[in-house]
Amino acid sequence: LARLELVLDDLQPLLLGSNLRDDNSSLTVDLTNPDIYRQGRLVFQKDLLHIVRTIVLWRGTAYQRIGVQNHGDRPAGFELTLLFDNDFADLFEVRGERRPRRGTGASRLLGPTDVLFEYRGLDDVERTTGLHFDPRPTRLSVNAATWQLELDPHESKSLFVAASRRRRGRTSLPR
């Protein structure tokens, strides 16, 4: 994936800290909300929501848990959106090299919880990246999954994302 960005009511969360396990088996990122205004009125003061992103790589799939907890004394309603994209750039392109030609790519929805990115390279090898979301997003497009969340005071919810890639043939979507 070239992009996997989390936004809260169209704003970037604030970084509290992160930790990579010594064996590189998981990455944990702690975030919180900035001040959130709606129609010029402060609706969420900074630091009311705690967001924990945990990413684990296992058997060719990247699994991510996004945990959200309301530390406020009132219910909190907000949108949490995961923006994503895949450009299938190779190592040389990532380092700034320009290619005279590229393969062809497409992205499509496979249902209410799945997105598939496809790319056929100049080597005629098909590469795919599949994304699976649980629970089902409120809205899903080929580059964004949005959940409308309502959390009571001190309530927590978890969202899960799995991303897998394959060469040749179809991607079996992760579950």
Label the predicted regions.
Residues L1-V43, W58, L83, S164:
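Beta-strand-rich N-terminal accessory domains
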Residues Q39-R41, Q45-L149, P153, K157, ...:
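Polysaccharide-binding surfaces and accessory modules of carbohydrate-active proteins
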